[in-house]
Curated annotation (Swiss-Prot):
Function: Catalyzes the attachment of proline to tRNA(Pro) in a two-step reaction: proline is first activated by ATP to form Pro-AMP and then transferred to the acceptor end of tRNA(Pro). As ProRS can inadvertently accommodate and process non-cognate amino acids such as alanine and cysteine, to avoid such errors it has two additional distinct editing activities against alanine. One activity is designated as 'pretransfer' editing and involves the tRNA(Pro)-independent hydrolysis of activated Ala-AMP.
Name by which UniProt lists this protein: Proline--tRNA ligase
Gene Ontology annotations for the cellular component aspect, listed alphabetically: cytosol
Keyword terms of this UniProt record: Aminoacyl-tRNA synthetase, ATP-binding, Cytoplasm, Ligase, Nucleotide-binding, Protein biosynthesis
Taxonomic lineage: Bacteria, Bacillati, Actinomycetota, Actinomycetes, Mycobacteriales
Amino acid sequence: MITRMSELFLRTLRDDPADAEVPSHKLLIRAGYVRPVGPGLYSWLPLGLKVLRKIENIVRNEMNAIGGQEILFPALLPRAPYETTNRWTEYGDTLFRLQDRRNNDYLLGPTHEEMFTLTVKGEYSSYKDFPLRLYQIQNKYRDEARPRAGILRGREFLMKDSYSFDIDDDGLKNAYIAHREAYQRIFDLLKVRYVIVSAVSGAMGGSASEEFLAESDVGEDTYVRCLQSGYAANVEAVVTMVPEPISSEQIAGLASATVHHTGDTPTIATLVDWANGADLGRTVTAADTLKNVMLKVREPGGEWELLGVGVPGDREVDDKRLGAALEPAEYAMLDDADFARYPFLVKGYIGPKALLANGVRYLVDPRVVDGTAWITGADELGKHVVDLVAGRDFTPDGTIEAAEVREGDPSPDGAGPLVAARGIEIGHVFQLGRKYADAFGADVLGENGKPVRLTMGSYGIGVSRLVAVIAEQHHDELGLRWPSTVSPFDVHVVIANKDADARTGATELAAELDRLGVDVLLDDRTASPGVKFKDAELLGVPWIVVVGRGWADGIVELRDRFGGDKHEIPVDGAAERISAALAGA
């Protein structure tokens, strides 16, 4: 096929959009692939839609290859199924809610587990109908508080979500592995650099969970990995290595807890300064202190309750880890009004004693094991307690993974230190188990004639996000550099000479390429060569053929936009040579 730029619906921009923060956002708008229509909302113009459809088809082919069957649910969904699973409430403000003219409640689907489960329950009733793998490629909607980075985080986005249905856990494991391997093939075809990390399931529920993260400095997700063992996880899923607890006899021999007047020491830094000037007989660091952070937490449909979180003083609380640990509950830090309401909370001097005495739930970092001694608040202004021992002087209500994970921390598998990096989530696979089947009573008749509850897997890929991810990983200072598998065209032919013979020759070359099955973009505009070259580099088609001054000598120039090489090739046989270059890309 030949597309003439003189007829193509396209306008490129020379300057970056004022609100664009990341390279993909800037380049996709400048190159005319997408246009913003509102916060987090984008129109797909012809070039952008071609890239999107190519990614979509790669995903579709791989899903079909593992036995997936494509269906399509509406984006507008009734409230009732999401009430059954409590996700009408759990999703909170991220859910787009609306009513029809009869005041019936609806939502714009953020995900479709409920609909898949109900559909399979309604259609199939025997173990003979399984295993089953269904998928859809559908727009999803989430009311992001701060849409950012263009199509990387929008309010409307295209996703592939697939679901496996099996009658036993072995079937679920097979489906999980099949999807995991299919995802690896997909991302390899798309030339995306990625890492697979352990993850938490969040509001989706379920047990085993892994994310596919595209490597990117602009990614919102932080992950860590151990280079010695290959362990990798996002920070929400990292399990803290727990020190060995000591025996009760050893605990009995520890120094007694003592309260000290520490003066004006409401911060960890001021407390450490005091401790090192107080002749405690040892050097004190922030890691020897216990910082107690106060929150208010509300379960879906419940009331606000106080929660104390104790972490070593050298660690900050990580909002993502805290949120993942508390999900589906929402939380907020206490403000001055809250502290005024609870006078036993002495800001800057909070300790476990007052929390436990007043019935406040108190969770601590896993490092706070029995026998560890801490310097922490004594619940009085200007006072702290030294050598407060866990398991002897206080017993928390449990542990919570809320402290930040740092580069250099020991890997949970004990193989070496962790290194940190940033990434963009492009895929997620879950072993959901029976959470949704339980919610809807999705049973079928088993081989023994008794009911069997279905077990499910859920597998998502951000199709529209992948357009931006590929643009992030494959661009330079001149513009985009699309891999051949997703480029809107195979070859961009630039007529860089006003000579009539060169124009005719370029048109004939494009026709020859078309006959060889090459998808050609022909820049037949009357613009200057400089404008045409800039647009060719900006648009990012992997192969650029320049028909210019060399035409009179029987020469055209072939440029590899992806690799950067340039070659002069004879006009005779040029189409075949270009086609061969494409085949080897």
